[in-house]
Amino acid sequence: MAVQTVPTYDSPCRMPNGLQWFEDELFVMDQQSDQVYVMNSEGYVTRVMDTPTENGSGITVGGGFLWTASNGITKFRDYRPTDTHIGWIYQLDLMTGAFVNRWRTPDGGGIHGLEWDDGKLWVTAFQPKAIHICDPFDNMKVIETFEVPTERLHGLARDGDGIWCAHTTDQIIVKYDVETGEEQDRIVFGEDSPAPHGLTIKDGELWYSDAVMTGVGVGHNDPDREGPEIGRITR
């Protein structure tokens, strides 16, 4: 189904690569600086947190913590002593972004999407292309996995009996059944529309962010747009 994207907030950062609504706050992961920007419901930044994340991508909130996807070697800032150049799932202080704990990704590689779900974490993977559900209270043990056929899994958003996953290169968002992994629904962006990176849901409405990765030397063939974007999806 084709959709309309509605730019809603000015992006607070150059590369808004992850989004998470939590209560009345929108958490934005900046892949360039690896800072997290927290915006209120009117779109104004209320605080900015430094994090140990490297090449930050997905973000979620749950269990009283902030969780970030550390996607390996950074390409957009100077190296820091905390950088390891490999993929991690970070557990951070919700108010300050300070380190609490971390775990390697299920496949040992990069990571784009995270979503909290009643004490568990949904996690995207690339080797193979899959979505895992993990237990952060049992050493990030993988509980279930379903493989998906589409490339470049990105933001995640839990919705009813399914989970939406942005597939950025294809400019689609697919809803997968959380029990079987079968496709339930599909949202198709137009050719000139944003490339969905971050994804979250608020009051039944999907929100997206486009980090505009074209021309930054990472090999992604995303639409060449004027700048980063945060908005809503209407159907």
Stretches found by the model and what they are:
Residues Q4-D10, Y44-M49, A98-R104, M140-E147, ...:
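A short beta-strand motif characteristic of beta-propeller blades
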Residues Y9-E23, P52-G64, A69-T74, T105-D118, ...:
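Beta-rich, blade/repeat-based domains predominating
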Residues P12, V28-S33, T68-D83, V123-P128, ...:
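Conserved beta-strand positions in repeat-built beta-propeller and related beta-rich domains
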Residues D30-G43:
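Beta-propeller domains
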Residues Q35-Y37, G87-Y90, A130-H132, I172-V174, ...:
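A short loop-to-beta-strand structural motif that recurs across blades of beta-propeller domains
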Residues N40-Y44, D93-G97, D135-N139, D177-G181, ...:
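Short loop/turn segments that connect beta-strands within beta-propeller blades
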Residues V123-T124, I131-V148, H154-L156, C165:
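Solenoidal tandem-repeat scaffolds enriched in leucines and small polar residues
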Residues H197-R235:
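Blade-level signature of beta-propeller repeat domains, shared across WD40, Kelch, NHL, RCC1
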